Amino acid sequence: KAKGVGCKGLCSKGPLVNLDKKGELYEALTVDEAEPFVKAVSEKKSYEPRLADANSSFFAKQKKIVLENSGVIDPENIEEYIARDGYVALLKAITEMSQSSVVDEVRNSGLRGRGGGGYPTGLKWQTVAKSSGAQKYVICNGDEGDPGAFMDRSVMEADPHRVIEGMAIAGYAIGADTGYLYVRAEYPLAVKMLKKAIKDAERCGLLGKNIAGTNFSFHVEVRLGAGAFVCGEETALIASIEGRRGMPRPRPPFPAMKGLFGKPTLINRSEERRVGK
């Protein structure tokens, strides 16, 4: 049975076909090769011309964390995500843990920022959580301006629910009820997947008002960026979401104290959201 899944991360090698039972990966399969490929598989043979070297020593000791579900599940099917323990972490957090204990767990994990600076994620969460103010925001930075960099794109296209779940957990931890997913407009497939994932999560009661019957509510909205490299900087990103020109401003005050619409704001990259989950 043929099944469509999200990107496996080997974008330059596509189209890819993975045979689960045999653990074989085939690369650059064309339409013309479909018939001989199916014939070889039906005869329980390997289609040597396109057999990828996925079991090389380079990959042998690698363990997928952020891309754990990528290329395994259908990103448009919330049931498949749930079947792989999707949203279990969120439900555990909001029903069994206090906000401070969630922050402590992230701090103890040693997770750091994925934008280059390596700032401790848990410390950032703690700072926003302790900031005064009834209204706080969560922003997921899914924009990347480096030419040929598709890290965020592949993450959001292949496993959007994991990004959303990570945002919701962060929202609970810091006391926020609203999150923004900042995605560049040049990623139409990622935008499509994220918007569908948000609707499906709301339909299942895993996002929106009173999640899973608790007092915790969290809403997520997708905001499109114009592809400006400078909007990778936190304050420029905030200005863009607010509808202003994406220009950095002097700091302090830092976004954790005064960010989106002047309120305490937590900003993390999409990779952090998934690892934090």
Feature-to-residue mapping (PLM):
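Feature of Fe-S/electron-transfer and energy-metabolism proteins
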Residues: 1-277
